[in-house]
C-alpha cells in the first residue's frame, strides 16, 4: 500500500497544506494529496478554501518536492476550472511525473485528458459509474457515509489497467480500523501493493498497519 498524507503530514489542523506538513511528509517518504486553486494574476496556489495572498505558490511546492528527489506520488485536487495550461507548464518545468489530477468538473477533466495529464476519475455512493473511465489513469474511491468498496470492485479496476486510490474513512469522520483490515486483506489476496494507494490523516499508523 502506498501512503498519501491528506493535505500533508500535519500535527495540528493549522498545519494542513503548509510547508511544514509537506516537508514532514516528504522526509518520511510519504506521497501526499493537496489542493490547487488560481490566485488571479498570481498563478496557481495551494488552498482548499478560497485563496488569499498568504497561500503557498504551487511553484514553491514543486521546488520543495524536487529537493527530496524521491519521486513520491502527488494527488493534485483541482479546486478551480481552467488551470490546465499553467499547471502543465509547471509540471514540465519541474519534471513532475508521479502525479495525478482529480476532482475537477467533467468538462474541465476532458481538457486535462486532451492535454495528456494523468487524470483520475471518481467513484463513490453518488458516482457509481465513473465518468470518462476508459480515458482515466486511475480511480479515486470515496466512501462518504458507508463502506461499499470490496475485492471485486478493486479487481475490476486493476484488471482494466487502472491505479486505485482509496479515501480513508477518517477523512469523513468515520472509524477506519475495520475498513483498513478489509483493504489489507484485498491487497494481499490480489497482490496489488504497487497499484493501491490510500489517502489518510494518519500516515504513520497506515504505514505500520499496511506494510508490517
Residue map of PLM features:
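Phosphate-group recognition and catalysis centered on beta-loop-alpha active-site segments
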Residues: 1-212
Amino acid at each position: 500500500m502506498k501512503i498519501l498524507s491528506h493535505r500533508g503530514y500535519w500535527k495540528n489542523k493549522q498545519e494542513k497544506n503548509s510547508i511544514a506538513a509537506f516537508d514532514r511528509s516528504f522526509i518520511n517518504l510519504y506521497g501526499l494529496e493537496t489542493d490547487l486553486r488560481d490566485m488571479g494574476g498570481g498563478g496557481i496556489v495551494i488552498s482548499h478554501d478560497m485563496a488569499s495572498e498568504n497561500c503557498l505558490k504551487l511553484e514553491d511546492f514543486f521546488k520543495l518536492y524536487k529537493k527530496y528527489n524521491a519521486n513520491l506520488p502527488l494527488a493534485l485536487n483541482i479546486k478551480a476550472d481552467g488551470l490546465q495550461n499553467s499547471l502543465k507548464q509547471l509540471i514540465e518545468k519541474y519534471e513532475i511525473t508521479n502525479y495525478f489530477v482529480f476532482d475537477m468538473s467533467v468538462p474541465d477533466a476532458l481538457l486535462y485528458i486532451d492535454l495528456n495529464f494523468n487524470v483520475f476519475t471518481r467513484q463513490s455512493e453518488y458516482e457509481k459509474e465513473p465518468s470518462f473511465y476508459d480515458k482515466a489513469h486511475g480511480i479515486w474511491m470515496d466512501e462518504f457515509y458507508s463502506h461499499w468498496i470490496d475485492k471485486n470492485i478493486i479487481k475490476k479496476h486493476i484488471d482494466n489497467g487502472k491505479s486505485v486510490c482509496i479515501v480513508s474513512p477518517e477523512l469523513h469522520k468515520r472509524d477506519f480500523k475495520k475498513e483498513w483490515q478489509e483493504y489489507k486483506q484485498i491487497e494481499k489476496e490480489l497482490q496489488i501493493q504497487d497499484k493501491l494507494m490510500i489517502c489518510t490523516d494518519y500516515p504513520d499508523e497506515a504505514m505500520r498497519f499496511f506494510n508490517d
